[in-house]
């Protein structure tokens, strides 16, 4: 059966040069991550500790949420609770309307992508400007992020340069030097910061013991977003909490090393309260996270810190791109989150996995995305989403393997497959595996026969 992912992936791989470049780009990030890990003898201890901290926090989430919100409110921060995406969007819109805001700048936030906040606000007359360079690029192109950390990594500098020329951001036609393009973007965004009436940030970590909202960036755009406007809104998923600074230190050592292969992000900003004369709001969002917590088989997805390491190492993601997935978060973690959101809608993505479990090996908080995808595959039949052809073949193989005599007899006829023309076995929608693979040749005698004849020892 041809899934939506496989159709999109086939389209992506038609451009062999770009596919190879995309693969190599992410593999280089994976190699940087490995180098960072090898420099720390305590690396595996850090991963284990991060997993334990997340497990503890999630299992005591109500207590930590209460502590976090009280610490914020004690310093004048207004805390809001959103049960779902719709309520989150309405809360944000209400805050902006109360302050008569027409333009809002924002730093990177996958939560706002999850809630589809930007189009909602734009429909209500609010101009939302992304200030992360990658996010701004894809916003101007009308695209979605293809990666949760490097949203525009699928684009080459020539594509970005031409778009900047069309939008009037770049003045030197044909100059696609990355440094020049970055400077053009900086000048373009400075005007947006000056004009905005509000700034929004995401939140990488919320420190319960102190009420800190911690934002990690490499561009400093979160600091500009909160420094210029007098209204600061923080969008935060309830799973982002850690107990204290000691716990935060563990995650800060892991996050950037796993995500981009750097020792740390260039900027780590802590927001505890509004600056004098300004106002700060924190919107804590559930949007299905409580349901995930109650799922005994897949609750560990809440341990994810959104570093993107599973995507950087995944051979399927690297060779098919982020837009091949039907859920807004691609890659191994996105497959799992999509299934938790709507298994009927996003079950196609489950096939986008080789089960190599490389993602399990690199995940800093030991979420085990590959192992969970395997578990999802086992439940496809119950969901009524199992591929009928694969199911029939599996049942046929089970029938054969349960009957040794029949299996042995069938092996004797296997060489007859060599006589079947390749056009009937390969390059056909009946056998997607055959595309790109040479036709295997069956030996005249099986290993079993050779063993019986004493020719194999």
Residues of each region from the PLM?
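Ferredoxin-type iron-sulfur electron-transfer modules in oxidoreductases and energy-metabolism complexes
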Residues: 275-301, 317-422, 426, 435
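Short coil/turn segments at secondary-structure boundaries
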Residues: 134, 263-267, 388-392, 424-430
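Short Cys/His-rich zinc-binding micro-motifs
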Residues: 304
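Extended amphipathic alpha-helical segments enriched in small hydrophobics
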Residues: 307-311, 356
């Amino acid at each position: 059966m041809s899934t939506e992912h496989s159709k999109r992936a086939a389209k992506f791989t038609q451009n062999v040069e770009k596919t190879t470049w995309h693969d190599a780009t992410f593999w280089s990030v994976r190699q940087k991550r490995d180098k960072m890990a090898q420099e720390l003898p305590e690396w595996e201890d850090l991963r284990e500790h991060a997993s334990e901290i997340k497990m503890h926090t999630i299992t005591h989430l109500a207590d930590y949420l209460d502590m976090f919100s009280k610490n914020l409110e004690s310093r004048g921060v207004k805390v809001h609770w959103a049960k779902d995406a719709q309520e989150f969007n309405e809360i944000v819109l209400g805050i902006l309307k109360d302050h008569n805001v027409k333009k809002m700048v924002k730093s990177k936030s996958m939560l706002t992508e999850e809630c589809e906040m930007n189009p909602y606000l734009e429909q209500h007359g609010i101009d939302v400007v992304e200030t992360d360079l990658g996010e701004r690029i894809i916003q101007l192109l009308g695209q979605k992020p293809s990666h949760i950390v490097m949203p525009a990594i699928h684009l080459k500098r020539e594509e970005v340069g031409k778009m900047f020329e069309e939008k009037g951001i770049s003045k030197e036609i044909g100059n696609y030097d990355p440094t020049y393009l970055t400077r053009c973007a900086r000048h373009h965004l400075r005007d947006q910061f000056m004009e905005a009436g509000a700034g929004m940030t995401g939140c990488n970590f919320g420190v319960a013991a102190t009420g800190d909202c911690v934002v990690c960036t490499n561009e400093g755009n979160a600091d500009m977003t909160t420094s210029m406007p007098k209204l600061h809104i923080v969008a935060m998923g309830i799973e982002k909490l850690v107990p204290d600074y000691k716990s935060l230190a563990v995650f800060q050592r892991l996050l950037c090393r796993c995500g981009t292969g750097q020792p740390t992000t260039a900027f780590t900003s802590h927001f505890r309260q509004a600056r004098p004369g300004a106002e700060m709001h924190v919107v804590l969002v559930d949007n299905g996270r409580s349901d995930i917590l109650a799922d005994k088989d897949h609750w560990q997805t809440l341990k994810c810190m959104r570093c993107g390491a599973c995507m950087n190492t995944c051979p399927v993601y690297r060779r098919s791109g982020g837009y091949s997935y039907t859920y807004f978060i691609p890659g191994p973690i996105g497959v799992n989150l999509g299934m938790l959101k709507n298994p009927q809608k996003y079950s196609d993505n489950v096939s986008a996995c080789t089960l190599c479990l490389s993602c399990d090996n690199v995940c800093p908080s030991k979420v085990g995305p590959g192992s969970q995808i395997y578990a999802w595959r086992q439940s496809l039949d119950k969901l009524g989403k199992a591929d009928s052809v694969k199911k029939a073949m599996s049942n046929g193989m089970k029938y054969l393997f349960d009957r040794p005599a029949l299996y042995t007899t069938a092996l004797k006829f296997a060489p007859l497959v060599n006589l079947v023309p390749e056009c009937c076995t390969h390059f056909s929608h009946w056998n997607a595996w055959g595309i790109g693979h040479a036709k295997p040749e069956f030996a005249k005698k099986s290993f079993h026969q050779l063993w019986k004849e004493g020719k194999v020892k």
